[in-house]
Amino acid sequence: MEILNNKTLPELAWLLLGPLVLFYVFKLFIYNVYFHPLRKFPGPWINKISIIPHLYTVFQGKQSYELLKLHRKYGHIVRYGPNELSFSSARAWKDIYGSRPGHQTFVKGTWYDGLSIFAAQDVRSIITERDPTKHAAIARVFGGAFSRSFLNEMEPMINDYIDRFIEHVKTKTANGGVVDLTFGYSSMTFDIIGDLAFGQDFGAIGRETTHPFILELNESLTFTSFHEAIQQFPALGPIARFFFREKVNKLEETARKGGEFALQVMRKRVAEQDTTSRKDFLTKVLEQRASSKVQMSEIQLAAQSWDFIGAGTETTASVMTSTTYYLLRDKKLLAELTAEIRAAFPNADAITNASTEKLELLHRVCLEGLRLPTGAPPILPRLVPKGGDTVDGHFIPGGTPVTIAPMVAALDPLNFKDPLEFKPERWLGKSGDILEASQPFSYGTRGCAGKAIALMEVRVTIAKMLYTFDMELENPDLDWTGNDFNNLLQFGLWVRPLLNVRARLATK
């Protein structure tokens, strides 16, 4: 008793609770490692006990990078949390995201609940809606916006923005100047998708500073990345908010402003519907809305357009930037592709979506640019249906969150030989690589609806850049990606370093 009398209240609390905490951790360790339904799947023992080590990589922006290291060590299947599994095989893409006769759908997990900018109002988009029936209803409304015929209608507008960007590069690089293509490509894709999503020219191309909307978008993606992580471990939420309260408050405020701006721009677009001849993603939707064939509020429309921008701006810009970097690092490949492009076209106006589809080397370069590294989000979680199902030949209990990290599958040495090397020739199909493992647009009915638009932007932009300019890196020794891409951070999407380039007008 004398020992207890000499203790302070906190010391007594620890003395009494400490053994209970240690017993709980020990019990958790024994159960999760030896008796849990996922006990047979490999992974670090600490991850089997708690999701916290994985969440730490999310907060660092290193989620894909750390998952890749785990897959290199453990193979195609990794248990990265007590209840979570990550896969990296081509077969897993089909099993998780595809449609299999006799199998139920693997619906999107709760991870997506934090992605919506209007989650507080319980408004979901074509990307964040988890319910298959509700998603199908949204997809029917916007289906025509991603058709080939719509893309053909929008091509002149898209090409106009690409040509504006080319002129901007000419101005920036005149007299030996340099242009940061990380910033430049981001501004261009933002203007393109912004016009398609909101019917408005935001004027990002040519700005010396980042457009405020892009800043709000990126900050919002950072916030949703934080929110997604917290959702996987709700008890951590109050603790994380306390220690990172200043950062969290700033991110929340920026996300709120982003939502307000999106709604403001949407209201302007709706008001102009009867007086504008411009076409965009919303044209048909607003026509049907006016005739009461579609019931969708302004905030629901804003949620769709916001997510179109989030999914179609930095993703596509990432692919353009990494592809340009790898081309400028490989003079032989750069010369071959430049020769193919300049031989194919009499002038820059002849460079179109249809004409670039015919260029075989350009096609392979773009596929490799999409693989290394992919512009996709870090993970794409789904829930195994009730009763369980098989993934990659293994039975997985129902309710288990399963995912493929697109970057991991694309860089897994079990799928690709020399996975960190930029080798467009692998897409000839003769290297023995498992090409189906690279799915930068995801897979199945919930894959990226804007795939055709993104591919067009990448092909036409790269072709026009190489047709117009002879380019070189400002720093020939630039290691833009870093070891295993650890120079590139992921907070929802990629955060990329500068890519400063010198460009001279080509003489043909």
UniProtKB/Swiss-Prot annotation:
GO cellular component terms, semicolon-separated: membrane
GO molecular-function term, one example from the UniProt record: heme binding
PROSITE patterns named in the record: CYTOCHROME_P450
Record-linked Gene3D superfamilies: Cytochrome P450
Family listed: Belongs to the cytochrome P450 family.
Segments crossing the lipid bilayer: 11-31
Names of required cofactors: heme
Species of provenance: Cochliobolus sativus
InterPro entries given in the database record: Cyt_P450 (IPR001128), Cyt_P450_CS (IPR017972), Cyt_P450_E_grp-I (IPR002401), Cyt_P450_sf (IPR036396), Cytochrome_P450_monoxygenase (IPR050121)
Its membrane topology: Single-pass membrane protein
EC number: 1.-.-.-
Binding residue positions for heme: 448
Protein name: Cytochrome P450 monooxygenase BipB
UniProt keyword Plastid present: no
Keyword match Transmembrane: yes
Record keywords: Heme, Iron, Membrane, Metal-binding, Monooxygenase, Oxidoreductase, Transmembrane, Transmembrane helix
Pathway note: Sesquiterpene biosynthesis
Compartment annotation: Membrane
SUPFAM superfamilies per the UniProt record, alphabetical: Cytochrome P450
Function summary: Cytochrome P450 monooxygenase; part of the minimal biosynthetic bip cluster that mediates the biosynthesis of bridged polycyclic sesquiterpenoids derived from sativene, isosativene, and longifolene. The sesquiterpene cyclase BipA acts as a versatile cyclase that converts farnesyl diphosphate (FPP) into (-)-sativene as the dominant product and (-)-isosativene and (-)-longifolene as minor ones.
